[in-house]
Amino acid sequence: MRWSPPLRLRGSGPGWAAQEPTWREARPGLVAGALKRATTRPSGNWYVVGASRDVRVGERPYGRTVGGTEVVLWRTQGGGLRAGSGVCPHLGAPLRDSRVVCGTLVCHWHGLALDGAPFAGWQPFPVHDDGLLVWVRLDEVGGEKPTDRPVVPVRPARGGAVDAVFTAVGRCEPQDVVANRLDPWHGSWFHPYSFIDLSVVREPEGDGDDAFVVDVSFRVAGRLVVPVRAEFTAPGPRTVVMRITDGEGASSVVETHATPLTRPDHERPRTAVVEATVAASDRPGFALARAVAPVLRPLMRRTAGRLWVDDLAYAERRWALRSTGRFPG
């Protein structure tokens, strides 16, 4: 196979103000249709609560509120994952602030000990660790037919990839986050520091081929760019996956998971964005990137964080307009 450089030197293309407007292509009905199909797909009541690395053996428990339900997670001495109500059944202590002793969760108020089995009114929740993200099944929150496992997107093999997980919280609902990701046309206008020369080459055609296909160049520095083709799909009601299908890093994915923190009827909803990036490459030099993955992960999170400053503003604005009957889409 002929070698090609991973970076390209972009020619004198149009600047931000001179690029082709995309508002005609970004038809509100098209985005709304893709969103409706996504949000009606089953989830089995599974919610992403964080990165697998957030819950470690021998460390303090990890807490998250999902749909108004407090959840606590911890690991046994053998690395097994446990999850359940974050409220102590004795007097309501926040178990996320308790301690793990020899794999047992011990309440810091009165010493009630939980090994993960039902006890004294405390109930465990089904939990799944896919190797990168941790999922909890909350049947009362989801209200769907439960499934044994969540729908985990196909990812590059972990041994040949570098991954990072970024988390942020916004004042909006999950659908506002999903709608943002199902609007690829905003990329080079709203994020000119990261994307350029973006064009949507194929729109969704329904459930049989429900994907946006996008040609875009990622900015590296100055005129140096990485051109790729990417596909956006929504395998579940709170998940959007961007997968590079052609170009540098083919098979790499960015999974965006939107987890509601508040009840569905909350006047000021809050949603956690948990975004997992799994980068892969068949170039021999990528082995070096894997070797220094601990150094790269903070940089990957910083890149995601910069984008989500803007995208959460988009999602929060969308919710603010929807909640007051002013959203034009």
Question: Which residues make up each language-model segment?
Answer:
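Short Pro/Gly-enriched beta-strand edge/turn motifs at strand-loop
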Residues: 43-57, 109, 181-184, 237-241
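Short beta-strand-initiation
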Residues: 44, 57-59, 69, 122, ...
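Tryptophan-centered short beta-strand motifs
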Residues: 43-46, 81, 160
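Rieske [2Fe-2S] iron-sulfur-binding domain
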Residues: 50-155
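A short, structural micro-pattern
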Residues: 43, 121, 128-130, 252, ...
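C-terminal catalytic domain of Rieske-type non-heme iron oxygenases
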Residues: 149-329
